[in-house]
Amino acid sequence: MEKSLLKNIAINFAGLILPVFVSLATVPAYIHGMGIERYGVINLVWALIGYFSVLDLGISMATENHIAKARDANDGSIQRIFWSAFFLNLATGIAGAVMIWFGAYIYVVHIATIAPAFQREVLQSLPWIAVAVPIANVSWVFSGAIGGMEKFTLYNTNQTVGTFLFQLLPLAALYLISPSLAVVVPAAVIARFLAALLLGYGTFRALGITGIAKPEWPLIRELFNYGRWLLLFSGANMIATTLDRVVIGSMLGAKSVAYYATPQNLVTRLNLLPSAMLRTLFPRFSASGSEHAGALSHQALAFLNCAFTPCVVVALFGLAPFLNVWLGHEMAVQSAPVGRVLVIGVWLAGQSSIMSVLIQAKANPAQVARVGWIGLPVFALVLWLGIRWYGLLGAGVAVVAKTFFDYAAFLYFSKLKPQPIVRNMAGHLLFLIVATLCADYMDSLSSMAAIGVALVVGNLGWSYCESSELREVVARLRQRLLPSAG
């Protein structure tokens, strides 16, 4: 792949992984300072705000797509796109603020099981909770605009600073003023506002914006017509990603949900590299011609398999020992088998997502949305049958079956050459199947480590044989290293 793309992938990967470490460092301090119940309540508040992300209406990605396409035009279209998206999301954000004000009151008072003292604290925070919705809506437009310009260093710098503000400012308020939610929630919203200001300043610089422009209704309609399909696709994905836990809970009980959700939450952390690639590739696909975007897709899929598959092999062997140390022997025995199956699902979903963003950027986003909704009832049926016949393992197999369905559908609609893509995928998948079987039937850590290393080396060798680009990279490295060695 192009050096600029590899650089942007590395930047986006760093931008995704740094907030994880910040959260890991601050969560114990929050729990210690607020108490477990208050911390649980504030997480319910953020979850409630998160549901209102639907009010973005897919406009942030539509903005990214349209700005990427307009980058080379010097006709002022970028500013018109930005301001139309900005005012649209501001309006839906204000509407969301009104809805969450009343919705949060009903939820806290009549639905959620919250102690009366904490209820009062949340109700005192309601105006701040409402303000958080338009702040988030506008911030997504800023993110989409910067992404469309491929200014990823600027974006991730602002995001990292924003994450630090969001984690540390409420923490300071907690210890210096009061652990009350009436103090911590406003501090968090102020942090979000400051982060939005920084992101907005960066957006104005990246786009060269010098003044405010009126929104244009034709542009708003165009953005909405594009974004609505992304919204529908996101909705189908949101249902699919929670449906397995809901069905497991209704058929097998809450204990089985814990055995399933624990490895699921763990293995989804492997998504960082595919997510970094998607963030990088979407604007580039949008700005490129169809032929160039197709060539980039082939390169991206080969790169993802080469870089990601060895990591997945390590995860397959390391999952059970990690769960055993982290949560005990019973959790490892119950969760590791289904966790390994889910790892393969995450691996294949990363490839599917690259093809899906290609379709969204270059073809018709409606096709991706239709695949999501058509596959949903089929997935529900397969999930129910899998759990009924095979329990948790059946649920994991159903998830993997859905990723294969998505993979095949997106490959068809992307109009890429299927033979080299499927051959490359199947070769890497074979290594993962062998790793899964070995990890399932082996108890010796030393034996698992030896076979794991052998499979990683073998997989890298397969990538070397399959990828002419990788062979060129190795040749260049050899030319650099051998003279210095002499």
Short names for language-model regions:
Residues 156-205, 374-379, 392-413, 453-457:
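Hydrophobic alpha-helical transmembrane segments
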Residues 6, 133-161, 182, 343-374, ...:
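Membrane-interface junctions at transmembrane-helix termini in multi-pass inner-membrane proteins
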Residues 439-486:
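Membrane-proximal transmembrane or re-entrant/amphipathic helices at the cytosolic face
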Residues 1-5, 181-185, 197-241, 280, ...:
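Interhelical loop/hinge segments that connect adjacent transmembrane helices in multipass membrane
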Residues 7-23, 162, 187-203, 217-286, ...:
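Transmembrane helical elements of multi-pass membrane transporters/channels
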Residues 4-68, 93, 97-103, 132, ...:
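Signature of the first transmembrane helix
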Residues 57-73, 148, 208, 263, ...:
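Helix-loop junctions and terminal segments of transmembrane helices
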Residues 107-128, 316-353:
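Interfacial segments at transmembrane-helix termini and the short loops linking adjacent helices
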